C-alpha cells in the first residue's frame, strides 16, 4: 500500500481553520498517510496546535522552523517526505474525506493526478469552473497542447482543454521520485507565482496524468487571502517570473508556437498588473499608475513580446480585445476597458 506525504505549511492560521484542516486529513478513508505540518515560525499558537495533533496521531510529523515563507516550508517538507506520492494542502482549507482514496485509485501508470475544488466563502459554496469531464492524458501531442495552455494561461479558442487547477499546488498528487530526481523545488525568492513555476517544471517530466472531474478540495475565500491583497513588489515579481519561464522553456527560442504562447502570457500578465498593482485601491502611487504602466511596457520582456503576439491564432473574445489594445499600445483604452469590465463585475457581484 503506497504512502502519500501530505504537506501543510502553517503560518498565522485561525485556530478553527487549522483544526478543521488537520482533522479532514487525519480522517481520510485512505489511511497510509504521512502528514507533515510545517510551522513556519508562526507567532501565535499554531505550532502548539500542530504538536497536540501529533501527540494523538503517529502519522503526523511537525517541523518547526523560523519564518522563511511558504516556499521554504514546502521545500523543507519535500526533503523530509518518504511517501511515494506527495500532495499539498493549505492550512486554512480542508478536504473531502475520500480525496486521497479517489486520487490513489487513479495513480496507476500516471505521473500525476489532478482534481477539482470547491470555492468556499462563509456559508456559500460553488464548484470551481474547470474542465467538465474526467480525462486521462497519455498522448504526447495532447499533453503538449495542455502544457501550452498552462504556459499561456488563457485559451485561444473555446475548443481547447483548460484545467485551471493544474496551475496551483493543491488538488494534485505528485510522484515524489520525479520531484526528487529532477530537483524540482519552489522558488523561495518569489513572493507569488512560485507554485505555477513548480508545476510547469514538473509537467516537463510527465508522460501521463489523469484529471478527476470531481471537487475533492475546499478552497477557502476570505479577506486574508493573498490573492486579494496589494503587494508592492507585484510588477517586479511578475517580470522576474516571466524571465524564469523563459529560462525554463528553451522551446520559446526554437518553436513559433512556444514563442507566441510565451508572448501571449507576457500580455496576459501585463493586463493582470493593471488591476492587481497599478489600479489596486491600496496602491499608494495610484495617481501615477498610467505613467508607470507606460514605462513598464517599454521595458523587456513586455516591449518585444507583446509586439510579437500573433492575434490571428485566437478566436474573437475578450482576451483578444485586451491583447489587441496592448499590442497596438492603446494604453489609455486598456485602462478604460479594465475599469469598464471591473465596474460590470462589481454590479454582477463577481470577485
Residue ranges with predicted function:
Residues 279-351:
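Membrane-interface aromatic/basic loop that binds lipid-linked glycans or pyrophosphate carriers
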Residues 70, 91-209, 217-233:
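Donor-binding/catalytic cores of nucleotide-activated saccharide
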Residues 13-27:
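Short, well-formed alpha-helical segments that are part of the catalytic scaffolds
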Residues 2-5, 24, 34, 197:
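Cell-envelope/extracellular polymer assembly enzymes that use nucleotide-activated donors
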Residues 86:
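Short aromatic/hydrophobic "clamp" motif used to bind/position activated sugar donors
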Residues 214-222, 228-256, 268-302:
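Catalytic core of nucleotide-sugar-dependent glycosyltransferases
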Residues 65-81:
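Glycine-rich, basic loop-to-helix element that forms the pyrophosphate-binding segment
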Residues 31, 39-48, 90:
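A conserved acidic beta->alpha catalytic loop
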Amino acid at each position: 500500500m503506497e504512502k502519500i506525504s501530505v504537506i501543510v505549511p502553517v503560518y498565522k492560521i485561525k485556530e478553527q481553520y487549522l483544526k478543521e484542516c488537520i482533522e479532514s486529513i487525519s480522517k481520510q478513508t485512505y489511511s497510509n498517510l504521512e502528514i507533515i505540518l510545517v510551522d513556519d515560525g508562526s507567532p501565535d499558537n499554531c505550532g502548539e496546535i500542530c504538536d497536540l495533533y501529533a501527540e494523538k496521531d503517529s502519522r503526523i510529523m511537525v517541523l518547526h522552523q523560523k519564518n522563511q515563507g511558504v516556499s521554504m516550508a514546502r521545500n523543507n517538507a519535500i526533503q523530509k517526505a518518504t511517501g511515494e506520492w506527495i500532495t499539498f494542502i493549505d492550512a486554512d482549507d480542508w478536504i473531502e474525506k475520500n480525496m486521497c482514496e479517489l486520487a490513489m485509485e487513479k495513480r496507476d501508470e500516471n505521473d500525476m493526478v489532478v482534481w477539482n475544488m470547491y470555492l468556499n466563502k462563509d456559508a456559500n459554496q460553488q464548484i470551481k469552473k474547470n474542465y467538465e469531464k474526467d480525462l486521462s492524458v497519455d498522448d504526447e501531442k495532447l499533453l503538449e497542447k495542455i502544457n501550452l495552455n498552462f504556459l499561456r494561461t488563457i485559451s485561444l479558442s473555446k475548443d481547447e482543454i483548460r484545467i485551471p487547477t493544474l496551475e496551483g499546488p493543491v488538488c494534485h498528487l505528485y510522484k515524489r521520485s520525479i520531484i526528487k530526481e529532477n530537483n524540482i523545488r519552489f522558488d523561495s525568492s518569489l513572493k507569488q507565482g512560485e507554485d505555477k513555476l513548480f508545476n510547469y517544471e514538473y509537467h516537463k517530466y510527465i508522460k501521463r496524468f489523469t484529471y478527476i472531474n470531481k471537487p475533492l478540495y475546499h478552497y477557502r475565500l476570505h479577506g486574508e487571502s493573498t490573492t486579494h491583497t496589494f503587494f508592492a513588489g507585484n510588477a517586479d515579481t511578475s517580470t522576474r517570473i516571466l524571465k524564469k519561464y523563459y529560462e525554463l522553456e528553451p522551446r520559446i527560442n526554437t518553436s513559433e508556437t512556444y514563442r507566441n504562447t510565451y508572448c501571449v502570457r507576457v500580455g496576459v500578465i501585463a493586463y493582470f498588473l493593471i488591476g492587481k498593482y497599478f489600479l489596486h485601491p491600496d496602491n499608494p502611487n495610484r495617481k501615477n499608475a498610467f505613467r508607470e504602466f507606460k514605462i513598464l511596457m517599454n521595458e523587456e520582456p513586455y516591449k518585444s513580446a507583446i509586439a510579437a503576439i500573433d492575434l490571428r491564432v485566437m478566436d474573437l473574445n475578450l482576451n483578444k480585445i485586451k491583447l489587441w489594445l496592448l499590442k497596438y499600445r492603446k494604453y489609455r483604452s486598456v485602462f478604460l476597458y479594465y475599469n469598464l469590465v471591473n465596474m460590470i463585475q462589481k454590479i454582477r457581484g463577481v470577485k
